[in-house]
Regions:
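Nucleotide-activated chemistry modules centered on ATP-dependent adenylation/adenylyltransferase
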Residues: 1-161
Length: 161
């Protein structure tokens, strides 16, 4: 994860999922580096796999909203790099599972609603990727409300918390 707050949130989400399902039969690995770089994060799962430290990597990456909707978001980072209409592989490299990669956050919000998770799981999840370029005070484990990811969350769920 890029930020220590992401690692803290991941623990909260996994714990809440275990509580809600009654399933505690898993191992949860988190890797946090204050010197985060994309190449490190891309390489790390292969190192764990080589050491037989896990069998599968689950990632919660979602698709981006339609271009016309995300033009309203701060920064509009993905307009040139991600096409919301492109169908992406859900299972990659023989061990990486990205089940939500072809669904935008509005679809995820529908799933939360369908399974009555808006008042239980949603409050412990976090989308914020605040950094000094966004401005304002570091929100810690809360949401800044100003970054692209907070705008996406608000767009999909109609709220941040």
């Amino acid at each position: 994860t890029k930020q220590i707050t992401g690692a803290k949130s991941a623990v909260n989400v996994v714990y809440k999922c275990a509580q809600l399902t009654g399933n505690y039969n898993f191992e949860h690995h988190i890797d946090y580096s204050p010197d985060y770089i994309d190449t490190y994060v891309e390489r790390l799962p292969f190192e764990y796999l080589d050491k037989k430290e896990f069998n599968v990597l689950y990632a919660g990456i979602t698709n981006v909203p339609p271009i016309e909707d995300r033009k309203l978001f701060y920064g509009n980072f993905y307009e040139d790099t991600r096409n919301p209409d492109e169908v992406r592989e859900v299972f990659r490299y023989g061990f990486s599972y990205v089940p939500w990669t072809n669904y935008d956050k509005k679809k995820i919000a529908q799933i939360y609603n369908e399974y009555n998770l808006l008042d239980t799981l949603f409050p412990v999840t976090r989308s914020c990727e605040w950094n000094e370029h966004v401005g304002g005070k570091d929100p810690g484990i809360e949401h800044c409300g100003n970054c692209w990811w907070c705008h996406e969350r608000q767009w999909a769920f109609g709220r941040l918390k």
